[in-house]
Amino acid sequence: MVCHTPVSAVLHPQGTHGGVPLLHPLSPVLHPPMTPCNILYIHSHDTGRYIQPYGHAIATPNLQRLAEHGVLFRQAFCANPTCSASRAALLTGSYPHCNGMAGLAHRGFKLNDYSQHIVHTLRAHGYQSALAGVQHVASHKDGEPWKTIGYDRHLGHPGEAHLRAAEFLAEPHERPFFLSVGFVETHREFPGEHPEDDARYCLPPLPLPDTPQTREDMAQFKASARELDAKIGHVLDALARSGHADNTLVVCTTDHGIAFPRMKCNLTDGGIGVMLIMRGPGGFAGG
């Protein structure tokens, strides 16, 4: 059955967190209760908007396909241009200076209250939760991060996130699920230049100077983006085979801008501008 609940109500169904207003379940704008939709949350590191659907000469056909069948947000911004703070804001609905994640999780920052994380809100509404790969809002210093956050299941480490996510999607599920699939790509270090991306013809992003070194750097970023796209495609193909696609909301985004000067860690459009693509279930015109 297709879920007809508004996206904002699915993501944060009640109250306010840290002064950020959220929909209340009794709000008159909500439709009558329907079968809850699954949520597939796909996220990358340091990608900004440097993918094919945003007009860049970077071959990401799976993300292009997702955009064509979903909705591409051209003016999406993160709440903070650093990894943990951005992710924590998105997943709690509260600003980093309110939720405690004012820096990086592996440098000692943490949420004041992990029960604010979306997995707890969704659990109260009957959801199961699973994490595959990167999370970056809890540290190994405090135990197993997925348990600290409150996920029901941990499926695998970053290098195998797409494989473990595909296995999860192939399982039968009696309850709606929130599946977080986190990728290391396109974080530095880059994997090296792809044969199809000749550095001599890779234009570096402004305001970087156009030099052989910056072209080589951009060529390597493009190779990382190709790898990210292939892994996302693996997950999306698994979703299509699973029978869950017609009742699954797909959210694909990144934490902040690319790891180049005046971008990541900077309050510029290049630092806080992020890709955001959402697809279905139902009611999405596409593009």
Language model features with spans:
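Formylglycine-dependent sulfatase
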Residues: P33-G287
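Low-complexity intrinsically disordered segments
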Residues: V2, P13, H31-P32, L208
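Short, low-complexity intrinsically disordered segments enriched in A/P/G/S/L with frequent Arg
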Residues: V2-T5, A9, G19-L22, P28
